[in-house]
């Protein structure tokens, strides 16, 4: 929005905006490949002024540099301050710190030029499998392509895929799966069979052939079994992945429980994932808590259009404060329709191009008898694909 005037705008508010100007100036510099030291200095300044989102950004920078111990220091500060993205990353990293410490050790040797061939293979493989960074992994492993080292070939295939060379990438996935049943190649092939052909049985056979207990494979087996309507097996594999603190598997398991009408189990697993920093789990948990509140007093729920669950509202407030626009929109439903908070929350969500927020602002201004603004927001909502309904369609025509 600010384009080339962004720096000028943010500079006006340095030290005057509780770290907001510093935070967004740092983001702007990141997008334009600015000086890393300057970016870190701005984010450090933002944290000192109370902007807790900056902790996550600093942690993310150190993660990309493979400095995980340093990253965890900042992510912990963000977690302790209540920042949910920092919490998620901190908990995710915590499960992998043994691998990450080894990466730090080997990366130091690489930078010093003292790393052995086997250690270089180990480092590249860890960066690929535990950090999910095929670009960095390829830089480390490319010398081993000539010996058909599977992680090196896989990293190359991912880069080809990113360059829209799908056919070449799939040929490599087939090669390394045939070569040694490499689990990442198996996942690539299985996911294509599922998405493209709905061939769940063959996809499952490929995954079984890996004999892998990696959470990626366990969770995807659960997904396949769910699509095959074998819900007991789906639960078994989702649970195996969830037991390893895989948050995606927890969310899938929660969804499975919801479809099976096992709401108590869904609530528990969503709560576990939410406490580990999952925004989507928190959002789903809030829905369940609100539904349970309605069941306690259905007559009141029908009479009062404002949502009632205090627990759900508290969760949505936290998610909204973390910048989640869907939570902002849902949180607005906990206020009477003429309350100023309805306008404030939906404006924040609209700034993130949330189409429901555009519609809600149209309704808000309609109730305020502000024809110009209500029509403006209904028009924007409609232009962005939101169905505003026959009544407001007719209202726009007048």
Language-model-derived ranges and their functions:
Residues 30, 63, 95, 128-129, ...:
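Position-specific recognition of the canonical hydrophobic site in helix A of tetratricopeptide repeat
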Residues 375-398:
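Terminal, low-structured helical/coil segments at or just beyond the last alpha-helical repeat
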Residues 24, 57, 89, 122, ...:
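Canonical tetratricopeptide repeat
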Residues 33-34, 66, 98, 131-132, ...:
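Residue-level detector of the short coil/turn that links helix A to helix B
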Residues 16-18, 49-51, 81-84, 113-115, ...:
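Short helix-capping/linker turns of helical repeat alpha-solenoids
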Residues 10, 43, 75, 106, ...:
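Hydrophobic/aromatic packing residues within the alpha-helices of TPR/SEL1-like helical repeat arrays
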Residues 27, 60, 92, 125, ...:
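Residue-level recognition of tetratricopeptide repeat
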Residues 6, 39, 71, 102, ...:
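Single-residue signature of alpha-solenoid repeat helices
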């Amino acid at each position: 929005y600010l384009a080339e005037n962004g720096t000028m705008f943010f500079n006006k508010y340095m030290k005057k905006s509780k770290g907001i100007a510093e935070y967004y100036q740092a983001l702007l510099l990141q997008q334009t490949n600015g000086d890393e030291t300057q970016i870190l200095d701005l984010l450090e300044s933002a944290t000192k002024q109370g902007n807790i989102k900056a902790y996550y950004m600093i942690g993310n920078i150190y993660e990309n540099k493979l400095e995980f111990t340093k990253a965890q220091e900042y992510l912990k500060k963000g977690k302790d301050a209540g920042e949910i993205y920092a919490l998620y990353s901190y908990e995710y990293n915590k499960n992998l710190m043994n691998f990450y410490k080894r990466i730090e050790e080997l990366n130091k040797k690489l930078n010093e030029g003292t790393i052995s061939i086997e250690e270089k293979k180990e480092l590249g493989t860890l960066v690929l499998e535990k950090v999910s960074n095929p670009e960095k992994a390829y830089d480390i492993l490319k010398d081993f392509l000539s010996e058909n080292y599977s992680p090196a070939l896989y990293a190359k295939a991912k880069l080809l895929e990113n360059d829209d060379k799908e056919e070449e990438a799939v040929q490599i996935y087939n090669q390394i799966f045939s070569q040694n049943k490499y689990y990442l190649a198996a996942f690539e092939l299985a996911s294509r069979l599922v998405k493209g052909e709905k061939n769940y049985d063959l996809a499952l056979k490929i995954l079984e052939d890996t004999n892998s207990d990696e959470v990626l494979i366990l969770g995807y087996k659960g997904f396949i079994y769910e699509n095959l309507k074998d819900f007991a097996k789906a639960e078994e594999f989702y649970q195996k992945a969830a037991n390893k603190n895989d948050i995606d598997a927890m969310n899938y398991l929660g969804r499975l429980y919801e479809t099976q009408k096992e709401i108590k189990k869904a609530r528990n697993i969503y709560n576990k994932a939410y406490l580990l920093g999952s925004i989507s789990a928190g959002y789903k948990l809030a829905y369940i808590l609100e539904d349970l509140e309605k069941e306690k007093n259905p007559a009141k729920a029908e009479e009062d259009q404002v949502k009632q669950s205090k627990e759900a509202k508290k969760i949505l407030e936290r998610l909204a404060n973390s910048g989640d626009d869907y939570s902002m929109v849902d949180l607005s439903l906990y206020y009477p329709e003429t309350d100023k908070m309805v306008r404030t929350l939906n404006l924040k969500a609209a700034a993130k191009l949330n189409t429901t927020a555009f519609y809600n602002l149209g309704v808000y201004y309609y109730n305020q008898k502000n024809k110009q603004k209500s029509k403006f927001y209904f028009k924007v909502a409609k232009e962005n694909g939101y169905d505003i309904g026959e009544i407001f369609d007719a209202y726009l025509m007048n």
